């Protein structure tokens, strides 16, 4: 068959299997270079060098067969990446090298030795882990991934990057970076203003290491950073201030004694006065212990000018702390303390974040996929959740950025610029003000719901909540990985953990009560036995509550999906409650709603398809013909662990928790858990599904009344009388697949628009993916939805005779917000014994190999029928009838109408909303001349230039004084006008593209030729 160019993106080439190999002689040369670098350049001891050489040798064969799968694809760069990854793994997992004194090596040393930056390192490291996972497990044990702490360190880097920018912005607003008026008649050398900046960052880093856990949450770290700002305000010379303490709106909290500094900072940075006061106290203690400074008995008497018009209550002044003659010494002492305290076992030197020019930082973002940071720009397909997105503004939604007349971006203390840090602080304020004051026990109304069940379930529910939350919020989750310190870090972690546990418990009871109230209105009765006695439902609710608390504080050591493992549920289980949880908590901040929407996308795109997902336990009932493949791949979920097993595993004390009256009933909600496709049940249609938003992709006529919530979690194996006798599993799987189809539609539209494909091609791609969902569901098993979409686009391009290569598709995909390189670099396959390549068992291949060896053999009949323009043949209809829950495959619908991104309020003072234009609309509305006045994300007005630089160019053009020819037209163009324009364009291009397609259109394989 004819071939086409292999995909590539951003300069990297993705080739088929067997490409990019080098000979054995090249491998030997690599070993020599690696050994020489370990000994001469890095000076590693014999133990570390021996371990590194062992890992390098055992993974060398994988490296030689994957020479184009990392970085730009050049052998030299791939060798540098691979060597760096090997050394990092040895430094984290090896038996020695826990510190510099043991001959260890830090991540910074590794990066500098191989001329890499931190952004590229973390982007490429997951690919290394996928390929070398079996080798690492053999050398270091099955828990190597947990001990490597790669995700935690990456999230920590993201936090530090955000905090450093937050600190720089705050410092520049409060102080001068350059001393324009140095003091006269000073015998000592003038202290540079930048030295004060460095002092603040170093003091913060020492505070994090000595007082907080090594991987502390973002909110606690921000409190510590604000406490450092308070110390700087009190001690930095007045001449370096950028504000007038009496007149600045940033210090609005005043009393007869002057400005209340702590209260003013709390208002400005959305911190808690109690937490900030504690952080300031810890900072002062460090100054006494490390810098050996003594606090003045009366702060106001020690320094009149710096504390003038400031209420000294709660503040401490240290004489000579930041005086010019002692600043240099203070910096040296902090540097020494930091170097002595930092754990060098693969760690970063966090001082580099104060230097924007540091080559190790690199450029780009690490937040996508690794850690969800609210407040960042959201692209269309992230905003348009496959579930019914509920993103209405809430009272706690943060204010928007406002351009200040002074040019510093601050309208007032209440109009700080929106950043991920400020958004996290605002969301934490919601927890503090709305959830924390609630009682930690069920309310009277909720207790009445519990007692109205066939058996009072109060003790069961409170016991379960105590055990599950105890498993999530344990010291082992947050406090065990800390730096050696003489201070009481464990005690601080225990207090913090208990506070977060209480917040999750209160949120759980609050939302549960709201759900029960809504259910009684639907059922016209108070008996909610089926819902309130369901074990899986409660665990999902507790997990959702805990996840929101963890997401609010931006914890590093308990990032999603950690809550799933702790609670014993799967991603498919959690997906059932997300929409309902959001609907029943009216005060939930917008950013937390977005967080849940993004989680649902992750669940649908890949996590629900992973091995061990409970989705397969329902699918094996709904589609009996898939049972052989599900069992062959071993995809079924294990039984949900009992509460007693969870308590024993996490050493949770049951003292104070009510006993479980009937131990056998603990498993009753899951007693019909699917292990065989021949059982039966009485579940009604899923209440979490809005009938207007989700319909089964294979039965669009289901329009039943919204059923009660308690029907969502019953066993999937009995007939459902509300749906014409179909099994509950069939209804549930239909709902799930409809969400998959909607998510696919969103992703397909975004990528097809970027590739500038016609509407007809877009609809063909969507129709093909729909057919795969219905008839070839097994293609999704253990894979990512984007892998199927990428292959579908290329397949449709081939039958449509478009000059579109896989290389161009991947290049466009890499610009999408949801892109992860692993999607096209590593696709799961399970070779059957009859495979033509002779391989057997599990493997991960590039997307071209998957397309040629798996996708095309499976989907070729569908592609041929799609190219011929005919409906599925009789054989396929009969196959769908056997596989699916419905008697026949319906006619595929046209591409669904999808909403644009929700409009956002951009002004705190005026009701001004902005709804971003999609690429297709923007290209239609803007002429070539007018496009130069707009800066678009992902597209520059000039080659090789970022949108941020575009803004400067645009401002310069607008302020140049040149007359604009013609009159500006500010008329609002409706979506209808745009749609008509696009429809005309698409119709014309589609007609031209598909005019010559016949039933004999060949389905071509993709070959790795350039």
Curated annotation (Swiss-Prot):
Cellular component, GO annotation: chromatin; nucleus; transcription regulator complex
Region (Spacer): 620-730
Name listed for the protein in its UniProt record: Retinoblastoma-related protein 1
Bias (Basic and acidic residues): 664-679
Function statement: Regulator of biological processes that recruits a histone deacetylase to control gene transcription. May play a role in the entry into mitosis, negatively regulating the cell proliferation. Formation of stable complexes with geminiviridae replication-associated proteins may create a cellular environment which favors viral DNA replication.
Location of the region described as Pocket in the Swiss-Prot/TrEMBL record: 419-861
Segments of this protein annotated with the region Domain B: 731-861
Region feature (Domain A): 419-619
Gene name per UniProt: RBR1
Source superkingdom: Eukaryota
Subcellular location as annotated: Nucleus
Organism of this sequence: Oryza sativa subsp. indica (Rice)
